[in-house]
């Protein structure tokens, strides 16, 4: 991962880093637009808190897909700007 991507990914997580459960596996990939975590068969993408700093503007901050669907262009199972909704979704 390039230093730029590492710095950007760090900024994406800055405000919620302490809230990310320890059992989530960081599977971030430099070619993705934002960092991602794997938990319970779900891939959780976490974009920048500030929308105009996101590579893809006009989208919600958090996206969840089934891990098996990665790279297939499927519609997310959940799109939200609220981290509490992400936690609830992946734990059900």
What are these model-derived regions, one by one?
Residues 19-22, 71, 91-92:
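Structural alpha-beta junctions
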